[in-house]
Structures are given as structure tokens and as C-alpha cells.
């Protein structure tokens, strides 16, 4: 497995995606993140393992289509993003949940 610079890995993951579907996937140890579009699966795996100190079993990626947005007569597009669904090893789900959803 190639080695990645840990300073660059933190910039790959933008934010966790919390939707109804993502919440249902959390019951199966799958967590959804928004990542930069040029990130590869090995880079995403290394970034999640480095940020959350968990063992990643599998990474699925999805590049949804850009949505049109209109302001008056001007038509533009929302920014492109990539969605990564990361499967975490059994037993590590507590580590990642403590970071994503801290107790208040």
C-alpha cells in the first residue's frame, strides 16, 4: 500500500454527510463523507484511518451530478463534490461516533 503524507490527508475529507439514508447506513457500520472530487479510494481510506484511528474495510465512492441553480436570468451550477461511503471494521464504530457525534 502506498504511503501518504498525513498533512495532505486531512484536506481530503471535507465534512460528514448526515442525511436520512446516511443515518440508516450507520447501523451497518457505514459512514458517509464529502471528499474532494480528485481523491482516490486508497487516499480516502488512509485519510479516514488517520483522522479517526479506525480500521477501514471498504470504500465506495459516488460522484453525483451537478445541480443547476438560477439567480434571475443567470444560470449556474452548484459545486461538484464526491461522496464516500466508508465501511468501518466491527468494534471501531464507537471511536468514530465519539468524534462525529460528541456528547453535549
Swiss-Prot record:
InterPro entries: Nucleotide-bd_a/b_plait_sf, Ribosomal_uL23-like, Ribosomal_uL23/eL15/eS24_sf. GO terms for cellular component: ribonucleoprotein complex; ribosome. The keyword rRNA-binding applies. The keyword Transmembrane does not apply. GO terms for molecular function: rRNA binding; structural constituent of ribosome. Signal peptide: none annotated. One of its GO terms (biological process) is translation. Keywords: Ribonucleoprotein, Ribosomal protein, RNA-binding, rRNA-binding. Pfam families: Ribosomal_L23 (PF00276). Gene3D superfamilies: 3.30.70.330. It comes from the Bacteria. One of the early assembly proteins it binds 23S rRNA. One of the proteins that surrounds the polypeptide exit tunnel on the outside of the ribosome. Forms the main docking site for trigger factor binding to the ribosome. PANTHER family: 60S RIBOSOMAL PROTEIN L23A. Part of the 50S ribosomal subunit. Contacts protein L29, and trigger factor when it is bound to the ribosome. Belongs to the universal ribosomal protein uL23 family. HAMAP family: Ribosomal_uL23_B. This is Large ribosomal subunit protein uL23. It comes from Nostoc punctiforme (strain ATCC 29133 / PCC 73102). The lineage of its organism: Bacteria, Bacillati, Cyanobacteriota, Cyanophyceae, Nostocales. The gene is rplW.
Amino acid at each position: 500500500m502506498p504511503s501518504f503524507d498525513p498533512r495532505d490527508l486531512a484536506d481530503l475529507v471535507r465534512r460528514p454527510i448526515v442525511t436520512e439514508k446516511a443515518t440508516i447506513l450507520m447501523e451497518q457500520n457505514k459512514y458517509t463523507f464529502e471528499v474532494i472530487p480528485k481523491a482516490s479510494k486508497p487516499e480516502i481510506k488512509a485519510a479516514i484511518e488517520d483522522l479517526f484511528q479506525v480500521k477501514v474495510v471498504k470504500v465506495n465512492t459516488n460522484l453525483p451530478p451537478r445541480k443547476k441553480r438560477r439567480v434571475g436570468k443567470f444560470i449556474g451550477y452548484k459545486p461538484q463534490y464526491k461522496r464516500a461511503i466508508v465501511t468501518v471494521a466491527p468494534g471501531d464504530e464507537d471511536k468514530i461516533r465519539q468524534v462525529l457525534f460528541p456528547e453535549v
